[in-house]
Structure formats: structure tokens, C-alpha cells
Amino acid sequence: MDISEGNKTLVTEFVLTGLTDRPWLHVLFFVVFLVVYLITMVGNLGLIVLIWNDPHLHMPMYLFLGGLAFSDACTSTSITPRMLVNFLDKTAMISLAECITQFYFFASSATTECFLLVMMAYDRYVAICNPLLYPVMMSNKLSAQLLSISYVIGFLHPLVHVSLLLRLTFCRFNIIHYFYCEILQLFKISCNGPSINALMIFIFGAFIQIPTLMTIIISYTRVLFDILKKKSEKGRSKAFSTCGAHLLSVSLYYGTLIFMYVRPASGLAEDQDKVYSLFYTIIIPLLNPFIYSLRNKKVMHALRRVIRK
């Protein structure tokens, strides 16, 4: 839909071109991503229910893990259902209001996840490096407060970008060459200059992603040195097993996020950017519940107790 304003025709609906311009692949992609979405939701929501119902998992580590699972479920839900609709809809239209809403919920869950990963790294640092002080330094009350702070920051941060986004007008093009309403793609088709918007994305991205990543790196560096000091091979194996999964998830998540949002314009192909976006919007939310659960003995014991019932 277009609205006339003076001599300009303002665009209020956009066309999402999706992952491919080959129509014969749409049905195949629909089936693949539907299966991925269902597995993602079952994995993450199942993990939340498991942690909620099992008293043995009512500990800070699993509280953060449950928070991460909820954040991943929100990330996937903000992107995948609309993408599935577009695979079957020849027009693939999305309104400006829907576009901004999709961006808000994605940005909110992504911001929350950055801080949750920091909390989880700190939790592992305290548990491995200061086990005797763990009940004091990471109590259930403190972990609940930290979890709440992560979600509050995640709720507030995207409002800055949404308010700036509402200042932009779209009057020339309405085609977004992407599979969701990615904010940098909206900047490309805006009529008025998005330089302030782009600057805020870079500044907030740098101030959120880089300090949180550095905190995680420092925490795990300390953990690594502590592990290497352990004489027990069993103790080393257990600690590496616990932290290795976390580091894998962090590397994938931060690597793609920083490459997308904390970098100068590089003129890279849009298809390459789509691949990076797929990692933090769809692939990582799919993998996280399995990365954290399959190597965690307490989670697996809790799952076996549920199956036996």
C-alpha cells in the first residue's frame, strides 16, 4: 500500500525476497525450515519445562539455561513463522508495522541473549574457580536478579532503534532483499538519510557485544588456567565438558553478530550476509538446547526421570 504525502508516495508495505529467487525451491525450504522450527521449539520449551519441574535443576546454572532457552525460542519465533508464510505466499508482502514489530522482538531477544551468555560464563567461573564461595557469590536470589536485569535491558535497548526507525520514510523502493526485516536492509531503501540510525546501531552494537564478549573471554581464560592446575584428569574432563559447549555456542553467536553489526560497510554480497544471519536467527536457537543438554549429566538424569514416569 502507498500513501501520498505532498509530492511523495510513501511506502507502507514491503516485499521480502527471502532466501532464494528460485520458486521451485520454496516448497523444499518450507518443509526444511518447518521441521527446524518445530525441533527448535520442542528443544527449547522442553528444556524450560524440564528445569521448571525438576527440583534438582533449581540452581543458578539451570536458571540461566532456562532463560537462554526462552530467549532462543523468542528469536526463532520472531523470524521463522513469517518466513514460512512467505515461502507459500507469492506476494511475500509485510506491512511496515509488522516489519518494525519483527525487528523489535528479534533485537530484544538477541540483546537478552548477549547478557545471559555473560551470566552463564560468570556462573561457570565462580563454580570452577571458587567452588567453596559459590553458594555466596551466586545464590538463587542473585541469579534471579541478574536474569531479570538481562531481560529488562533486552526490552529497553531495541526501543532506541525503533524510535529512530519511525523517523525514516520509504518512498522509492519497497523490496527488501532478505528473509526478514533486517534493520540494515531497511536503511538501504529509506528516502531520508539513515546515517544517525546506522551510527546508533554501530555504537550500541559495539557497547553491548564487545564488552560482553570480552567478559566471557576473561572468565573462560581464568577457568582454563584453573582447569590446567587441576591434577585430577577426571576433574579436567568434567570442567572442559561443561565449558566447551558454552564456548562453541558463544563463538558461533558472537562471531556472526559482530560481523553483521560491528563492522564498516564492506560491500559484501547480500547472499553472504543472509548466511551469517541464518546462524544467529535460526541455527543457533536450534543447536543451543542440545549443545547444553546432551553433555550435561544433571539435565540428562532429569530427562530420564521424566521418561520413566
Swiss-Prot record:
Extracellular side: 1-27, 78-101, 157-198, 261-273
Pfam families per the UniProt record, alphabetical: 7tm_4 (PF13853)
Keyword Acyltransferase: no
Listed transmembrane segments: 28-48, 57-77, 102-122, 136-156, 199-219, 240-260, 274-294
Disulfide bonds: 99-191
Glycosylation sites: 7
Compartments where found: Cell membrane
Main location as per UniProt: membrane
Membrane topology: Multi-pass membrane protein
Gene Ontology annotations for the cellular component aspect, listed alphabetically: membrane; plasma membrane
Record keywords: Cell membrane, Disulfide bond, G-protein coupled receptor, Glycoprotein, Membrane, Olfaction, Receptor, Sensory transduction, Transducer, Transmembrane, Transmembrane helix
Any GO BP: sensory perception of smell
Gene3D superfamilies linked to this entry: Rhodopsin 7-helix transmembrane proteins (1.20.1070.10)
Ranges per topology, Cytoplasmic: 49-56, 123-135, 220-239, 295-309
Single annotated GO MF: olfactory receptor activity
InterPro entries: GPCR_Rhodpsn, GPCR_Rhodpsn_7TM, Olfact_rcpt
Role played: Odorant receptor.
Record family assignment: Belongs to the G-protein coupled receptor 1 family.
Protein's name according to its UniProt entry: Olfactory receptor 5AC2
Species annotation: Homo sapiens (Human)
